Amino acid sequence: MQRVILVVLLLSCMAVLSVRADNSEMLAPPPRPEEFTSAQQLRQYLAALNEYYSIMGRPRFGKRGDSFRKREFFRTNGERYPEDAAAWTEFQ
């Protein structure tokens, strides 16, 4: 029984890796010709480049962790602010 589970796990890993490898060609930028011979060729290249950057330039939310931890870097002289420094009741 353990061999069957191991074989199924191995085959699923290989299937996932093969699917990921097939999509890797989509991540490559379009090939740039040595010389543009016509305006149409330049338009096609720029359209392909625009499509590439529209896919690759999308923000990936949640991949960088908690950005609030970085606020400590911008404080001068290590000063600390109280948690309730700006309570809404003070402005009413």
UniProtKB/Swiss-Prot annotation:
Keyword S-adenosyl-L-methionine: no
Cellular compartment(s): Secreted
Superkingdom, taxonomy of origin: Eukaryota
Annotated S-S bridges: none
Major localization class: secreted
Phenylalanine amide sites (modified residues): F61
Alphabetized UniProt keyword annotations: Amidation, Cleavage on pair of basic residues, Neuropeptide, Secreted, Signal
Free-text tissue specificity from the UniProt record: Highly expressed in the abdominal ganglion, to lesser extent in the pleural-pedal ganglion and much lower in the cerebral ganglion.
GO biological process, one term: neuropeptide signaling pathway
Signal among keywords: yes
Segment forming the signal sequence: 1-21
MF-aspect GO terms: hormone activity
Family matches, as InterPro entries: Pancreatic_hormone-like, Pancreatic_hormone-like_CS
Gene Ontology CC annotation, any one: extracellular region
Family under the similarity heading: Belongs to the NPY family.
Role, per record: May play a role in the regulation of viscermotor functions during egg laying.
Protein name: Pro-neuropeptide Y
UniProt source species: Aplysia californica (California sea hare)
